[in-house]
Amino acid sequence: MKNATIAAALSVAAAFAAFAGEQLTSLPKPPKGGRFKTPTDLVWPAKPGEADVCLWSGDRFACCSITIDDNCKPDHDWWLKLSDELGIKLTWFVITDHCVKKNNPGFNGTWADWQRLADAGHSIQSHTTNHKAKHADVPMPTDEELHSMYRDSLKAINDNVTNNFACCIAYPRGEPHPEIAAKYAIACRGVHGVPNAANAVDYMCTGKGAPGKGHVQMVAFGETSEGPKWIQGMKNLRRGWNVVLYHLVHAGRDDATRAKNAASAEAEVRYIASLKDERLWVARFDDAVKYGQERDSATLESALKGDKIEFTLTDRMKDDIFDYPLTVKVRLPDGWKSAKATQGGKPVVVRFVSHDGAPYALVEAVPDKGVVRVVSK
């Protein structure tokens, strides 16, 4: 769907109404025990024709999203250069009134600056219109203010930035108002400092981990000897989703301090990126929450039918928003050396892999887009 059409859909709360339990725009809070039992390792279906929705895109072991708040234009070139070198995409949560009112564009950026980042493949999301939250002498925003802060910020981004779909919010100061936010956003980032267990993501107030090795290794490996010490026992984080938050990287009163802070951030990001090919899916925030909610609500049925495998993949999410492909691992018949696939008659991305001598296909399929047929090349 074109950006303008999606933006129009998001401009009214009615677009986020759920009908008879289907076409959901976000999932409710997870039950106490989680939505499912998280597999401790990669899953390998045993019999030809069997299939499984991978926990993360590309069958990665875990997930990490790097987010940047508060506009911070002075860092844009630094982030663009580093992310391009490392082959990763980032998510900016933007305070939009600064752009609408052209407040201090040297720090807050202009729409042209955000378009530049979107054109490079990064995600531009909302940190509300004005970052208002209760603190010190500032009162809690009224419900009317919150509706405007959430709705108008998403609309401003979608009206001014193409090649991008603003559908997520980072709560100012981590102050959540999920009932109101759910009328406009598919997910919101909180700031409580723990990565997300894969089976228990609260999509309307996600956790926020840290960029240090302790947090990263707990999701990527399920264990760590790095600090903080308290995280070392949180085995439920294995295969989870770590959401990293940065503000101004080049912060400090003098050049030496600014350089030191930037070097520290660069080392953290480089370590995360070093795990991206197999252990981590380094995902834009909106891609991760689309994948997660599609996966959490998906139904998969597959069967071997003669010389082909067919499967259907459905979910409970709103189809014109939740369009990120899920990775479906399909056990192929013995002897297959390659595979190709179509969904609804159109070719889809397939990667052939083997495990313990058995052939598999990793098929990228979008829920509710038709039957998927897998055949040998």
Predicted stretch roles:
Residues 25-36, 74, 84-186, 192-212, ...:
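Metal-dependent polysaccharide deacetylase catalytic core of the NodB/CE4 family, i.e.
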Residues 21-65, 107, 285:
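N-terminal pre-catalytic segment of deacetylase/amide-hydrolase enzymes
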Residues 35-40, 44-50, 100, 158, ...:
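C-terminal domain-boundary segment and adjacent tail
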Residues 17-20, 172:
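Boundary at the C-terminal end of the N-terminal hydrophobic targeting segment
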Residues 7-17:
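Bacterial N-terminal signal peptides
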